[in-house]
Amino acid sequence: MQISITRLEKKLSQILPLAEAYQRSYNKLSEQYKSPEEMALYSRGYFLKKLWKMAQDSESAVAVLNIDGVPRGFVRYSAIPEYYTKPTDGQTRDLEKGMLDGWEFAWYRKVNFERDVQLTNKTLIVNQIYLDPHFQRHGLGTHLLQKTIPELKKLGYHDLIIEYNAHNKNAEKFYRGIGFRPFAKTQDFDHIIKKDGRTVFCISDVAIAHTTIDNALNSMRDKKLNNTFIMVQKRNGRAY
């Protein structure tokens, strides 16, 4: 198998297969701790719109993992939200509204967590990291981070944080294995879905973990891909 890493582009030929991989990965991770109402929202249309929006976001960097030329996973890095560097205030942040697959939805976060870690503008957040379940457990997720995090260091960034569902123990184990340590928790009022005159509240417990870039690189230093995979450089397109 051939592996390459490229930037996410606003092309359906790239986004369509990636949305399908994203959906399979998210459903596998979430089915045990998401409500049926919330899981029903995450159809392919949701992931298509989310990835299309990412491809247009000038303040994020999205690196796509391609296997035999087909997008199979990605990682997204962004500047940390402003409220991470402000005193705890309990105010609503990151409000988002819209129509999705015929449903009206809203998403918001109540910012009420303590900060034991000092965060600055040299900190990035790992917004998402997903890999098609068909290709998991081969070291590919770690490989994607190994190849992209050094580029962040070259740009002058020092720290990383990541958010994940607090009940997702597999995610926590993975992140701890690459140097992240939980330092805070909060809640997302993940979606408010209005359907048939009802409002359904889907609340998620969110864990937040931190590492320095140097610590992450040191933690991943000896981690290698399964020998099943053969590494090649990207021949066409822009490498990450």
Regions found by a protein language model. Give the residues of each.
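Conserved N-terminal entry element of GNAT/NAT acetyltransferase domains
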Residues: 1-28, 32-33, 215-240
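Conserved active-site alpha-helix within GNAT-family acetyltransferase domains
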Residues: 142, 154, 166-184, 189
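Active-site rim helix/loop that mediates acceptor-substrate recognition in acyltransferases
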Residues: 37-62, 66, 71, 76-82
